[in-house]
Amino acid sequence: MNWNEILFWLLKSGLFFFILITACAYYTLAERKVAGFIQDRKGPNRAGIWGLLQPLADGIKFLTKEEVFPTQVNKIMYLIAPAISMTCAIMAWSVVPLGGRIPLPQWLQDRTGLVFLDLQIANPDTGILFLFAISSLAVYGIIIAGWASNNKYSLLGAIRSTAQMISYELPLSMSVVSIVILTGSLKLTDISASQAGLWNIFKLPGFIAFCLFVVAMFAETNRLPFDLAEAESELVVGFHTEYGAFKFALFFIAEYMNMITMSCVVTLLFFGGYQVPFGILEGHVLQSLFGLFFFLGKVLFFTFLFVWVRWTLPRFRYDQLMSLGWKKLIPWAVLNILIASLYIQF
């Protein structure tokens, strides 16, 4: 790998990070706008035209707030916790493909040695396995935040969140196993390409896996109706209680990054990813560009679904949450692996 290739890769990584941060910023605005619509009010509309500068105002607010350290906290672990959550969210995003390969112009091929531009930072053979392995590490940031805060509300929220994430990682992962059985690959690009003729959602094992995945997805991202870790009426804001300013912003952004990543993953696993429907533009240079637009349209729907569910459904009780995961989702996930195995045989 020469210096031109390294520089090109660094620029692409920086661009993808900028896209993710910008998407998170405007996702917060979109959520507040949708919440306002559902509650029959306008939402943010003071910063810029239609409130479009509200994310910038919020970012400046978080960056300029005074950094306060409560006297009882373990400072080193207290600072490490939000960094772990943010790092895991960024690393999980790095293997998500946004589209197919785009051929580069000749002058750029000569300078970089690359023929195609992959619309993802990395494409390892263990793509989906890497994504869930990194996502599962985020639980360390949460439990460290609760423990280092030396606050009973923070600790209770962290314990709840840890138990919830570990419990729902099982059905989430097992639902993906059935898709891996159907497609025969762990690479997200291969899983998307295998759905060129028929989306996985229209196959029996794929439909069951989709239902399991969506429920577990809400629990994994700590969103309503599974936000037991941040139950305001019981735990103030859970493991966030002692965090403010930029440290809280890292947790906040990581949560929205995870929601966007999960929306991308559910699109890639069940809804054809970036495949252009009906074979339109097959082999054409614009196929990748149109594939990107179709992919983003599906992702926008699932990001909207997160918001819609948040402002529609009430919170589960903790015992209901655990019962649903261990008594309902996990048995169905195990059964679906068997169904997927039989499906490819017959």
From Swiss-Prot:
Keywords associated with the record: Cell inner membrane, Cell membrane, Membrane, NAD, Quinone, Translocase, Transmembrane, Transmembrane helix, Ubiquinone
The UniProt entry's GO biological process terms, in alphabetical order, are: aerobic respiration
Cellular compartments per GO CC: plasma membrane
One example GO MF annotation: NADH dehydrogenase activity
Q: Where is it mainly found?
A: membrane
Q: What is its EC number?
A: 7.1.1.-
Which cell locations does it reside in?
Cell inner membrane
The broad enzyme category this protein falls into is: translocase
What topology does the record note for this protein and the membrane?
A: Multi-pass membrane protein
Chain ranges passing through the membrane? 6-26, 76-96, 128-148, 166-186, 198-218, 260-280, 289-309, 324-344
**Annotated InterPro entries:** NADH_UbQ_OxRdtase_su1/FPO (IPR001694), NADH_UbQ_OxRdtase_su1_CS (IPR018086)
Report the catalytic activity.
a quinone + NADH + 5 H(+)(in) = a quinol + NAD(+) + 4 H(+)(out)
Q: Which Pfam families match?
A: NADHdh
**What subunit structure does UniProt give?**
NDH-1 is composed of 14 different subunits. Subunits NuoA, H, J, K, L, M, N constitute the membrane sector of the complex.
Instruction: Describe its function.
Output: NDH-1 shuttles electrons from NADH, via FMN and iron-sulfur (Fe-S) centers, to quinones in the respiratory chain. The immediate electron acceptor for the enzyme in this species is believed to be ubiquinone. Couples the redox reaction to proton translocation (for every two electrons transferred, four hydrogen ions are translocated across the cytoplasmic membrane), and thus conserves the redox energy in a proton gradient. This subunit may bind ubiquinone.
Q: Which NCBIfam families match?
A: PRK06076.1-2
- Please give the family membership noted in the entry: Belongs to the complex I subunit 1 family.
* Name this polypeptide is given: NADH-quinone oxidoreductase subunit H
Q: Which organism is it from?
A: Leptospira borgpetersenii serovar Hardjo-bovis (strain JB197)
